[in-house]
């Protein structure tokens, strides 16, 4: 039986919990390092998910099947960089 992957929202909630624990500063150093590493990994996974979602939203097909960049209200292409 395969285990289901956590949703984006579940991963975000886990990351927020880790950040709160680290901000409190009352956990042992070894546990803090482990939690930090887990947080970094979750952060990378969440960033990848957001980038994939952005690609999906920013690339649309027009009537002649050409990719068209989605325009944001500010006139950009949605790139945060």
From Swiss-Prot:
Q: Does the keyword Protein transport apply?
A: no
Gene3D superfamilies with a match to the protein in the record: Exonuclease VII, small subunit (1.10.287.1040)
* One GO MF term: exodeoxyribonuclease VII activity
Q: Which Pfam families match?
A: Exonuc_VII_S
Q: What is its EC number?
A: 3.1.11.6
InterPro entries, alphabetically?
Answer: Exonuc_VII_S (IPR003761), Exonuc_VII_ssu_sf (IPR037004)
Q: What class of enzyme is it?
A: hydrolase
> Where does the protein end up?
Cytoplasm
Disordered: where is this region? 61-81
A single Gene Ontology CC term: cytosol
Q: Which UniProt keywords apply?
A: Cytoplasm, Exonuclease, Hydrolase, Nuclease
Tell me one GO biological process term: DNA catabolic process
| Main localization of the protein described in the UniProt heading | cytoplasm
Please give the catalytic activity noted in the UniProt record: Exonucleolytic cleavage in either 5'- to 3'- or 3'- to 5'-direction to yield nucleoside 5'-phosphates
Q: What does this protein do?
A: Bidirectionally degrades single-stranded DNA into large acid-insoluble oligonucleotides, which are then degraded further into small acid-soluble oligonucleotides.
Q: Which family does the record claim for this protein? A: Belongs to the XseB family.
Query: What binding partners and quaternary form does the record give?
Result: Heterooligomer composed of large and small subunits.
Protein name (database record): Exodeoxyribonuclease 7 small subunit
């Amino acid at each position: 039986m395969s285990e289901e992957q956590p949703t984006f929202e579940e991963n975000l909630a886990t990351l927020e919990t880790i950040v709160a624990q680290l901000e409190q500063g009352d956990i042992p150093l070894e546990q803090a390092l482990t939690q930090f590493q887990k947080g970094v990994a979750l952060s990378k996974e969440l960033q990848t998910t957001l980038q994939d979602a952005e690609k999906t939203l920013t690339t649309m097909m027009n009537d002649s099947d050409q990719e068209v960049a989605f325009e944001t209200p500010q006139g950009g292409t949605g790139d945060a960089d």
